[in-house]
């Protein structure tokens, strides 16, 4: 498996980013994780030309991406658990436990994927034998500490099972 990483340096798609994605798909890329707001428009446009796939971000973007570029283009979306976050913070406010003025890193709070502050979309197209139950088991193992995921942003992660090609900035 090969992962290519490039930074779009903006939160909207444009001709330059679409051209970059066209090149990736033409050279064998199967799925683009379009992380950056509306930048999914460039990934979706390029994917639609060749039958590629897209992973959305922030919320379940399947309706937007598939609606604009074709049914089934969206594989999943890496979601911020906005409902879980809002509910947790409003509960803290009503219980007098809200601590304003600080930055928090929110993640897993339990084994239930829908209760967590990070999730994948309900519209996820599970494939290759990986099921929603497998996803739930994976979340449970992460919450239990059996599987760890680094949140370090100061260095590229060490990887052994994949090749990572860091391509810098598009813009």
Predicted regions and their residues:
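A residue-level marker of the well-folded mature domains of exported/periplasmic proteins
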Residues: 1-171
């Amino acid at each position: 498996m090969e992962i290519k990483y490039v930074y779009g340096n903006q939160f909207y798609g444009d001709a330059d980013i679409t051209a970059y994605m066209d090149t990736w798909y033409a050279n064998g890329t199967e799925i683009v994780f379009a992380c950056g707001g509306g930048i999914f428009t460039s990934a979706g446009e390029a994917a639609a030309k060749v039958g590629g796939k897209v992973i959305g971000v922030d919320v379940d973007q399947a309706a937007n991406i598939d609606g604009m570029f074709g049914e089934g283009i969206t594989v999943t979306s890496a979601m911020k658990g906005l409902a879980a976050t809002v509910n947790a913070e409003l509960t803290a406010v009503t219980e007098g436990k809200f601590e304003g003025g600080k930055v928090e890193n929110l993640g897993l709070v339990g084994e239930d994927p829908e209760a967590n502050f990070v999730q994948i979309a309900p519209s996820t197209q599970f494939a290759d034998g990986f099921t929603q139950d497998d996803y739930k088991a994976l979340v449970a193992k992460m919450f239990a500490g059996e599987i760890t995921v680094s949140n370090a942003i100061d260095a590229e992660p060490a990887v052994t099972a994949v090749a990572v090609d860091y391509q810098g900035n598009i813009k």
